[in-house]
Amino acid sequence: MELNGIKPAAGAKHAKRRVGRGIGSGIGKTAGRGHKGQKSRAGGFHKVGFEGGQMPLQRRLPKRGFKSHLLKFNAEVTLTALEQLGLAEVDILALKQAGLVGQLAKVVKIVKTGELTKAVKLTGVGATAGAKAAIEAAGGSVA
């Protein structure tokens, strides 16, 4: 087999359907668009959500809630991520340098997801009750 002899499998490729090319083709004249109406015309499609002039559903329903801007300043780190980090002392700066939290993060909390076997000393980082128990059980501390 040579590269210049490679072909698609038989029946894998077929010519595209050419519509509007005479009644003998079976899809001539109206070309599968039916008779008259907006959808039969060239460029005859409305934008998504348009309901013919009726107030669209998206605008009929009221707005709800808001997007908290505090989310970009708060971050969570799992015990599994701490385990893989492999540092004895962890603070916010170390987590930022490792890429575990964003550069804008001001508040970081450790959550109990996964296992921790190494002793880790946390400074300036919060922890949930379960995470704190797991860190202290592994010989670490939370300050």
UniProtKB/Swiss-Prot annotation:
SUPFAM superfamilies according to UniProt? Ribosomal proteins L15p and L18e
Q: What transmembrane ranges does the database entry give?
A: none
One annotated GO biological process:
translation
One MF term in the entry's GO annotations: rRNA binding
Signal peptide location: none
Give the start-end ranges of region Disordered: 1-51
* Keywords, sorted A to Z: Ribonucleoprotein, Ribosomal protein, RNA-binding, rRNA-binding
Q: Which GO terms describe its cellular component?
A: cytosolic large ribosomal subunit
The keyword RNA-binding belongs to this UniProt entry's keyword annotation = yes
Q: Which domain of life is it from?
A: Bacteria
**Gly residues: compositionally biased ranges:** 21-31
Matching InterPro entries: Ribosomal_uL15, Ribosomal_uL15/eL18, Ribosomal_uL15/eL18_sf, Ribosomal_uL15_bac-type
Q: What does the protein in this record do?
A: Binds to the 23S rRNA.
In terms of NCBIfam families, this protein maps to: rplO_bact
What does the annotation say about its assembly with partners? Part of the 50S ribosomal subunit.
Give the protein family: Belongs to the universal ribosomal protein uL15 family.
* Full protein name: Large ribosomal subunit protein uL15
